[in-house]
Design a protein with these regions (language model features):
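Long, low-complexity C-terminal extensions of enzymes
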Residues: 137-240
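Aromatic-acidic/polar surface patches that form glycan- and anion
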Residues: 7-11, 21, 67, 71, ...
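Active-site-proximal specificity loops/subdomain of glycosyltransferases
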Residues: 1-26
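Short, flexible loop/turn elements at secondary-structure junctions
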Residues: 1, 22, 32-35, 167, ...
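Long, charge-rich alpha-helical interaction segments
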Residues: 52-148
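GT-A fold catalytic core of metal-dependent nucleotide-sugar glycosyltransferases
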Residues: 18-58
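Short catalytic/ligand-binding loop motif for oxyanion handling, primarily in non-cytosolic enzymes
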Residues: 36-40, 45-48, 104-105, 172-175, ...
């Protein structure tokens, strides 16, 4: 991160500079701190023929929350640089892929609508190409430099979904329904389901989304810890 933008208290800002990490591979996977692998996983889950595996499916966006307003900022940039008709004409099989199931219903309904809307993003590990970040910066440098002055989160921010959507609109992805083996558990309302899913390894990837309002936080934390210890009894090299 350029020194003139420090100190930073805005994770969105840090994320738009991910490609600057020294020795970062062209193919990389971005994990937030609440994402966990709980089952066997191979690189093919994230990449095929050198391209990220992802779902290209629209979702509704009310713009009521700050996060949704940020997603709308992303889409305004996408519509500035991509022609939806041309993208769909070139890649209709990627957007209307049967593997998406009912999650692609808006794709069919909006097939002839001229503009992109917000894409679905499962709250879990996201595969990227470093060259995608470089391409976005090349084309949107002014907007991203302006955002770099936002030391704290702002309604005018962009998010990593900008890079995911750019990647998809550039046809740099392989269709894959990422919902089939991932699950997000808000621990405030689904702590028991989360503990059970970890212990039974019901998914490949889970997001354990916590917050300060979780009831019986200490007990929930302890039960999750026991579930992880049951499936991962040996310490990794990292922990030794």
């Amino acid at each position: 991160l350029p020194e003139q933008y420090l100190p930073v208290f805005n994770s969105n800002l840090i994320e738009i500079y991910m490609h600057k990490i020294p020795d970062l591979s062209e193919q990389f996977v971005y994990f937030n701190d609440d994402f966990f692998i709980i089952n066997h996983l191979s690189p093919k889950r994230f990449f095929e023929d050198g391209l990220p595996k992802d779902i290209a499916a629209f979702r509704t966006n009310t713009g009521l929350s700050q996060y949704e307003r940020m997603l709308q900022n992303n889409i305004r940039l996408i519509n500035k640089h991509f022609d939806k008709k041309e993208v769909f004409k070139k890649d209709s099989w990627k957007w209307l892929n049967p593997s998406y199931g009912k999650r692609a219903r808006l794709n069919y309904l909006l097939k002839y609508y001229n503009k992109f809307i917000t894409l679905r993003t499962p709250h879990n590990a996201q595969p990227f190409l470093k060259s995608t970040f470089e391409d976005v910066w090349k084309n949107c440098e002014n907007e991203l430099k302006e955002m770099s002055t936002h030391r704290f989160r702002s309604n005018k921010d962009y998010t990593p979904e900008l890079f995911k959507t750019w990647q998809i609109c550039s046809s740099n992805f392989i269709p894959y329904n990422t919902y089939q083996d991932t699950k997000m558990f808000p621990l405030m309302i689904k702590s028991k389901q989360a503990i059970k899913a970890v212990r039974e390894q019901s998914y490949t990837l889970v997001c354990l989304n916590d917050n300060i309002h979780i009831r019986n936080y200490q007990q929930t934390h302890e039960n999750l810890k026991k579930s992880f210890e049951a499936i991962l009894p040996e310490k990794s090299d990292f922990e030794i």
